[in-house]
UniProtKB/Swiss-Prot annotation:
Positions of region (G3): 81-84
Annotated localization: Cytoplasm
InterPro entries: EF-Tu_GTP-bd (IPR041709), EF-Tu_GTPase (IPR050055), EFTu-like_2 (IPR004161), EFTU_2 (IPR033720), G_TR_CS (IPR031157), P-loop_NTPase (IPR027417), Small_GTP-bd (IPR005225), T_Tr_GTP-bd_dom (IPR000795)
Enzyme class: hydrolase
PROSITE patterns xref list: G_TR_1, G_TR_2
Entry-linked Gene3D superfamilies: P-loop containing nucleotide triphosphate hydrolases (3.40.50.300), Translation factors (2.40.30.10)
Region (G5): 174-176
Residue span of region G1: 19-26
Name of the protein this chain belongs to: Elongation factor Tu
Length: 399
């Protein structure tokens, strides 16, 4: 079967469903595909298709995630749904499913529960920019006042985590009734998707951001100079442009004298390309894996940061024993391991803990032995002797 060409005629946005267990995330996801399928904008999927999510490995961590895609009038969406709560935590921290926005599903019958709060907090910490609320199971609540109270409670909760509670749309839906073909509730799903279209901003394309390429390999070509290879993470780079080499040692400036891909010469490389960049006046020993090549002045190296971390359980290949403040692992950042220290930590809700157990989620302060190009929202892994024992996201740069 020939692979269909991916039509790029609409802007692409990544979203997901988040919220408390059994509040109807997967049923709602199925309902969205079914309602849009009637307009030819999706392939209808049932609960079982989505719930039997295959396992994936991301940064050495096994995660169950279901991916569905669909379109609205103006956009193409990739939508992720996770079966278990632990999968959400791992997914959002590793960035396996990068979300440009999320649909927070909350049952009108229960109101916000423990994981509702935890997912809002997680969305804030990992930098999900916008939310839309689907107030689910509204067919089971007859009293309009109860629905109003739940809505108020959700808005207050969103405010308390610094989301704009008053402005976020809350749409009353019933995933189940819409799946069963009830036209009243089908129109509510359409209303929800209109809210998603309007409230979740279109992400800035990687190509439009300032140039950055993490160095994976370096070699010298006799008579031509030094070549650094890697995948361009964002932006573009033209032949003749000045770039900075950042990280590990002092920042220095060089000029790109050639861009090569698949042994062909290019005028410019752009986000997503695997390229070799020929650099003027740079010796092979001046540049190493783990450094980044960037647009001048766009990034500075740092040694201290705060991060949100998920520590792997023993069964996931993590540690068997706890660790304490002062623990010295390697931080795998972009393309290299950098030795560092976890100088302090609290549990994810900010309460003090003496030690970190496998399976915990923590806020930590990390300090690296040499400066590297780290940025807020960037993902990293924590490793010990080459195996991943934790995954994290930088929540704040300290120094």
């Amino acid at each position: 079967m020939a692979r269909e060409k991916f039509e790029r005629n609409k802007p692409h946005v990544n979203i997901g469903t988040i919220g408390h267990v059994d509040h109807g995330k997967t049923t709602l996801t199925a309902a969205i595909t079914n309602v849009l399928a009637k307009k030819g904008q999706a392939q209808a999927q049932d609960y079982g298709d989505i719930d039997g999510a295959p396992e994936e490995r991301e940064r050495g961590i096994t995660i169950n995630t279901a991916h569905v895609e669909y379109e609205t009038e103006g956009r193409h969406y990739a939508h992720v749904d996770c079966p278990g709560h632990a999968d959400y935590v791992k997914n959002m921290i590793t960035g396996a499913a990068q979300m440009d926005g999320a649909i927070l599903v909350c049952a009108a019958t229960d109101g916000p529960m423990a994981q509702t709060k935890e997912h809002i907090l997680l969305a804030k910490q990992v930098g999900v920019p916008a939310l839309v609320v689907a107030l689910n199971k509204c067919d089971m609540v007859d009293d309009e006042e109860i629905i109003e109270l739940v809505e108020m409670e959700i808005r207050e909760l969103l405010d308390s985590y610094d989301f704009p509670g008053d402005d976020i749309p809350i749409v009353q839906v019933s995933g189940l009734k819409a799946l069963e073909g009830d036209t009243t509730w089908e129109s509510k799903i359409e209303e929800l998707m209109k809210a998603v279209d309007a409230s979740i901003p279109e992400p800035e394309r990687e190509v439009d951001k300032p140039f950055l390429m993490a160095v994976e390999d370096v070699f010298s070509i006799t008579g031509r100079g030094t070549v650094a290879t890697g995948r361009i993470e964002r932006g573009k780079v033209k032949v003749g442009e000045e770039v900075e080499i950042v990280g590990i040692r002092d920042t220095r400036v060089t000029t790109v004298t050639g861009v090569e891909m698949f042994r062909k010469l290019l005028d410019e490389g752009m986000a997503g390309d695997n390229v070799g960049l020929l650099l003027r006046g740079v010796q092979k020993e001046d540049i190493e894996r783990g450094m980044v090549l960037v647009k001048k002045g766009s990034i500075t190296p740092h040694t201290q940061f705060e991060g949100e971390v998920y520590v792997l359980k023993k069964e996931e290949g993590g540690r068997h024993t706890p660790f304490f403040a002062g623990y010295r692992p390697q931080f795998y950042i972009r393309t290299t391991d950098v030795t560092g220290q976890i100088t302090a930590f609290t549990s994810d809700d900010g309460s003090n803990v003496e030690m970190v157990m496998p399976g915990d989620r923590i806020k930590m302060t990390g300090e690296l032995i040499c400066p590297v190009a780290i940025e807020q929202g960037m993902r990293f892994a924590i490793r010990e002797g080459g195996r991943t024992i934790g995954a994290g996201v930088v929540s704040k740069i300290l120094k």
